[in-house]
Amino acid sequence: MQETLLSRAERSVPRLSAALNDYYQLTKPRIQVLLLITTAGAMWIAGKGHVEPLLLLVTLLGGTLAASSANAFNCLIDRDIDLLMERTRRRAIPAGRILPWQAALFATALGVASFAVLAAFANLFAALLAISGIGFYVVIYTLWLKRTTTQNIVIGGAAGAIPPLVGWAAVTGDLGWSAWVLFGIIFMWTPPHFWALAMMIREDYRKAGVPMLPVVAGDEATARQIFIYTLVLVPVTLVLYPLGTMGWIYLLAAGALGLWLIEGAFRLLKAPNDRKESRSLFKRSIFYLMLLFVAMGIDSIFLFA
């Protein structure tokens, strides 16, 4: 009897681990790193180089819960699309390992937890901004824009630009001009980033009937749009200097990083059908945003010392 119970327990451990991993993957953890970096960067700037460790911790926790909720809802709603795409058909919901009602309950619990954490330990404004981000991503982007227009990621990019607003509001309780510049940076960064990805997996989107720009307009038109958005993005990043929010260290870093990103977008413009170039720009855009916000943090240490 003892051996039977022990063997059952041993068999249940891998199943439990696999189930927990499925729920964890619903939150799309890999794409949350940049959200946390932008949130922390905004808090650091808003606090002029100083943020209470507890406030930083709870805001990042609340932001993680909000992003996890939005991503889980996205997986739930897009389960029909995911089933048709090679990249996503093995996800837990289309594969039947997590039932739709279970995913809905999980996503709702994460959203409620996010609001509770931010409202209790940061402030109500930050909590409401986080909830608005979930709502925008789920209702406006996932339910509406993604399946109806090539501009889905342009307008939907507003959802990904909300985390720095949450971070700023957590520190100050309001939103100044600089907070909206941070919003604008991510808003303008989003199309080049995601269109580069869409160029890499265009056939998957075509099979699923998702009207991403490369599917509808082709790679050449997409590469042109990427280049245009990149050219607009770089000057937006420099606005923080004349506002007095950032100093010369950031200005130099933003300028150098901007030229690096423009060079990558130009290479894609010259070879729009080369998947190596779209993959290169996709990766470059990730490091670009990460290093840009790191530069903000470093600059604020000296600027507000």
Swiss-Prot record:
The chain crosses the membrane at residues 31-51, 53-73, 98-118, 124-144, 153-173, 181-201, 221-241, 242-262, 285-305. GO terms for cellular component: plasma membrane. InterPro entries: Protohaem_IX_farnesylTrfase, UbiA_prenyltransferase, UbiA_prenylTrfase_CS, UbiA_sf. Keywords: Cell inner membrane, Cell membrane, Heme biosynthesis, Membrane, Transferase, Transmembrane, Transmembrane helix. GO terms for molecular function: protoheme IX farnesyltransferase activity. It is found in: Cell inner membrane. It is an enzyme of class 2 (transferase). It catalyses: heme b + (2E,6E)-farnesyl diphosphate + H2O = Fe(II)-heme o + diphosphate. PROSITE patterns: UBIA (PS00943). It is a multi-pass membrane protein. GO terms for biological process: heme biosynthetic process; heme O biosynthetic process. Its EC number is 2.5.1.141. Pathway: Porphyrin-containing compound metabolism; heme O biosynthesis; heme O from protoheme: step 1/1. Converts heme B (protoheme IX) to heme O by substitution of the vinyl group on carbon 2 of heme B porphyrin ring with a hydroxyethyl farnesyl side group. Carbon 2 of the heme B porphyrin ring is defined according to the Fischer nomenclature. Belongs to the UbiA prenyltransferase family. Protoheme IX farnesyltransferase subfamily. This is Protoheme IX farnesyltransferase. It comes from Gloeobacter violaceus (strain ATCC 29082 / PCC 7421). The lineage of its organism: Bacteria, Bacillati, Cyanobacteriota, Cyanophyceae, Gloeobacterales. The gene is ctaB.
